[in-house]
Amino acid sequence: MGFTTPCFILKNTLQLREKLEGLGYRIGNKYCIDNNFLATDNNEMFGIEEPYLPEECNGYIHCGFNEELFLAIAALRDDTNYKQWFVCTSDYKEFDGKEWKVGDFDLNTCPDDFDNILPHWRKATVNELIEHFKDKKEQLCVE
């Protein structure tokens, strides 16, 4: 149980690695962590020197330069809902001034029980995250 979707991004910064640490990743190979590009797999982050070509992603989601997409996909887990993106499944009014419509996205920033999902929401899929965060100029790899 844990992280479910390997991915990589065409950048590698200390700030981005710190955000991954905040999600629960650890450095897999400290000798490669400063390479040009950054990837995640299982609970590890690691640097890669050459990016995968979109047609050769080998199970990794190619996030281009899109940091929001990379972090959203890297956050996907099967043991928690924390820091995961959710999609609204039915129109409803949460409170005065806050209404949700089918298809709205929201980031869960509250630690919660994994089994305690609100009835109007479901976890976003990889394809939905790509569509939500995509930059029309980028070519992304989806399997």
Residue map of PLM features:
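Short, extreme N-terminal segment that most often corresponds to the first beta-strand
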Residues: 1-28, 143
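Charged interaction segments
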Residues: 23, 31-143
